[in-house]
Amino acid sequence: MIEIIPATDIIGGQCVRLTHGDYASRKTYYRDPLEAALRFEEAGIRRLHMVDLDGAKASEPRNLAVLERIAARTSLEVQYGGGIKSREALHSVFDAGARRAICGSVAVRRPDLFAAWLAEFDPGRLILGADVRNGAVAIEGWLESSTLSAPELIGRFIPQGLTQVICTDISRDGMLCGPSAAFYADLQGRFPTVEITVSGGISSMSDIEELDRQGLRSVIVGKALYEGRITLKDLARCLPNA
C-alpha cells in the first residue's frame, strides 16, 4: 500500500497550512507542532514531512528548534525542507535531527552543488523538490518560476544517483480538489528508479487509493488530514503491516 506522509508546514514555530503556497492564506492548526507529531507517531506513522516556510523565504533554515524537538521526542523520520542552499545549512538540518533533506531551489540555481551533495552524502538522504506551477518548476518558496519542467530537472540528477523526488502540483495545493493522478503516473513511469512522492490536492482516501493503483509509492497529506477528511484511523490502514 502507498505510504502516507503527514505534512507539517512551519511559520513562526507553529504548524500552518497555506493555499496555493500563498503565505497570506495561512491557517494555524497547532501552536506546537510537536503535538501534531506525537499524534502521528501514536497512529503508527513512520515519516513526517516538515517544511520551514520562514526558511524558504529567508534562504536559510529558520525553524531548526522545532525540528530538534520533534527529532528528540519522537522516532519519526523527518524530511525537512526550506532554505537549504549551502553545505552549512544542509549540515545544520542533519545535525538538528532530520533523516532527509529536501532541496529545490539550489538544484535549479546551482545544479553542480546539488550533484556534489548527492556524491558526498548517501543519496537516500537527499530529496529533490520539483514543485510545478503551469508546467514549470517553482523556486524560492514558490515565489519565482524557473524555465525547467519537472522531468527536465529530475533527469539532470539521475546519473548522480537521485532516488527520491517530491513533486507538488502548486495549483492544487491546499485546494482539496484531488491530485493530478495521470501526471504523477507518467512521471513515475519515466523514472522507475526514483520514488516520486505526490503532493498537492489530496482530499480523501479515494484519491490515495487511486494513486496506489497507478503505482505511486508515497503521498504527502496536509489539509485533508488537519480538516478531518482523512483520519488517523485512515492513516493506520496504510501502514506496512496493517
Where are these regions (language model features)?
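Conserved anion-binding
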Residues: 12-25, 91, 98-173
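Glycine-rich, proline-tolerant flexible connector loops at the mouths of alpha/beta enzymes
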Residues: 47-65, 105, 167-177
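Conserved beta-strand positions in the central sheet of alpha/beta enzyme cores
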Residues: 49-52, 79, 102-103, 127, ...
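Conserved, mostly hydrophobic/aromatic
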Residues: 9, 40, 48, 93, ...
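Glycine/small-residue-rich loop that forms an oxyanion/phosphate-binding "nest" at active or ligand-binding sites
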Residues: 54, 60-121
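Charged helix-capping and loop-helix junction motifs
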Residues: 61-68, 143-152, 177-185
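Glycine-rich phosphate-binding active-site loops on the catalytic face of alpha/beta enzymes
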Residues: 92-113, 169-172, 200-207, 214-234
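Catalytic cores of alpha/beta
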Residues: 74, 78-100, 182-218
